[in-house]
From Swiss-Prot:
Cystine crosslinks: 2-16, 3-14, 8-17
Protein name, entry field: Conotoxin Reg12h
Domain of life: Eukaryota
Native source organism of the sequence: Conus regius (Crown cone)
TM spans (from-to): none
Keyword Secreted: yes
Tissues expressing this chain: Expressed by the venom duct.
Upper classification of the organism: Eukaryota, Metazoa, Spiralia, Lophotrochozoa, Mollusca
Family (UniProt): Belongs to the conotoxin M superfamily.
This protein's UniProt keywords: Disulfide bond, Secreted, Toxin
Domain notes: The cysteine framework is III (CC-C-C-CC).
A GO cellular component entry from the record: extracellular region
Length: 17
């Protein structure tokens, strides 16, 4: 899961995972 932040999406491009 990724943190609930704008621009953060589940996937290889999620910087807050």
């Amino acid at each position: 899961r990724c943190c609930p932040m704008p621009g953060c999406f589940a996937g290889p491009f999620c910087p807050c995972c």
